[in-house]
Amino acid sequence: MDEVPSSDESKSASSGKRVLEQSVHELEEVFKKFDANGDGKISGSELADILRSMGSEVDEAEVKAMMEEADTDGDGYVSLQEFVDLNIKGATVKDLKNAFKVFDRDCNGTISPAELCETLKSVGEPCTIEESKNIIHNVDKNGDGLINVEEFQTMMTSEMTDKSK
């Protein structure tokens, strides 16, 4: 018999999206502070200035390494989307793993269409098995018809960062 998540677990799963949405909004505000000239992107010099103003002793090589990590499109600047992606992926891995456990009802390391549907229904989201299969199909990188923890993290972070575009 499937174990039904407690109301606390269900609240945790549904509140996870709200927390991520709030995080995106907060990151947008931080981004605006980093973006000293207001051009919608952070340059290496803006990053260095803000880090130094916060008391961080960073050298040019460290700033360059930070920029390379964040600047995924290689244009030499960090866009809002890149900034949000970098911060959400690092900050929420533990939260997402905890949310994954709520969906993985049989604790086998994957979420089946039935588990996805049951969990969504338990938090008041209408769902059919067919809809669950479609959701899974969109994020199922390895083609096994299930969602593993990495695919779940990708699904959740892309859903949140899409809202900041």
Curated annotation (Swiss-Prot):
Residues spanning the membrane: none
Stored InterPro entries: EF-hand-dom_pair, EF_Hand_1_Ca_BS, EF_hand_dom, EF_hand_pair_protein_CML-like
Organism superkingdom: Eukaryota
SMART domains, per database record: EFh (SM00054)
Binding sites annotated in the UniProt record for Ca(2+) 3: 104, 106, 108, 110, 115
PROSITE patterns membership: EF_HAND_1 (PS00018), EF_HAND_2 (PS50222)
Binding site for Ca(2+) 4: 140, 142, 144, 151
Binding locations of Ca(2+) 1: 35, 37, 39, 41, 46
Location of the EF-hand domain: 22-57, 58-86, 91-126, 127-162
Tissue distribution: Expressed in mature pollen grains.
CDD domains hit by this protein: EFh
Keyword Cell inner membrane found: no
Keywords, sorted A to Z: Allergen, Calcium, Metal-binding, Repeat
Subunit note: May exist as monomer and dimer.
Protein name from the UniProt record: Polcalcin Cup a 4
Organism: Hesperocyparis arizonica (Arizona cypress)
